[in-house]
Amino acid sequence: TRAEVFDVANAVLDGTDAVMLSAETAVGRYPVETVRAMARVIVGAEQHPTLERAQHQSTPLFGEIDQAVALSAMYAANQLSGIKAVICLTETGKTPRWMSRMQSSLPIFALAEQVGTSAITALYKGVIPVYFAASTMKPSMINHLAVESVRKIAHLEPGDLVIMTKGDFVNVHGGTNTLKIIRIGDMIQ
């Protein structure tokens, strides 16, 4: 119905991560067509100009360091010209969740080793999970390999900018404390 179309569109504009059909709608005679129509509404709403820039309420105090890094990364991503993607190394999925709450047209790549973390981040708006086994890598190579794992997916070209967030140590929950702005093609450390 028209009301359901507006409900779906408004949910997207309000920053909802996922939508689902009600039992009443899902049991109709045309379930596949209903899902296709809902997908078209979602894509249309996501292309609305108000979603291209961050529109968040400023929190007076951050509760945690990783929250401050996540929100700072998204602010920089939306304000610095040339940023093509955000790369977020994550153990639990908490950092990309905070990032997804800030509306942006930029993709957020959540690099995680745990399948459960990737499954959770797949539900966040604008977040693309990528398997990344950081615990098997030399610490000096993690930044370079993280960018390389996203480069083809994001269609990154030399000169493009990406923002990366990560922690100093692998396998530490809530340890995101670093934000880097990286130019593709430059030596990454």
Regions found by a protein language model. Give the residues of each.
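Glycine-rich phosphate-binding active-site loops on the catalytic face of alpha/beta enzymes
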Residues: V8-P31
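C-terminal binding/interaction regions
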Residues: E148, A154-F169, T176-I188
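C-terminal helical cap(s) of enzyme catalytic domains, especially alpha/beta-barrels
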Residues: T25-H48, T178-I182
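Flexible, glycine/charged-enriched surface loops at secondary-structure junctions
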Residues: S22-A23, G28, Q47-S58, I83-K84, ...
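Conserved, mostly hydrophobic/aromatic
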Residues: A11, M99, V162
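Nucleotide-binding motor/catalytic cores of P-loop/tubulin-like NTPases across gene-expression machines
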Residues: T95-R97, Q103-S140
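Long, charged amphipathic helices and adjacent flexible linkers at domain junctions
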Residues: M38-M74
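Charged helix-capping and loop-helix junction motifs
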Residues: T1-V8
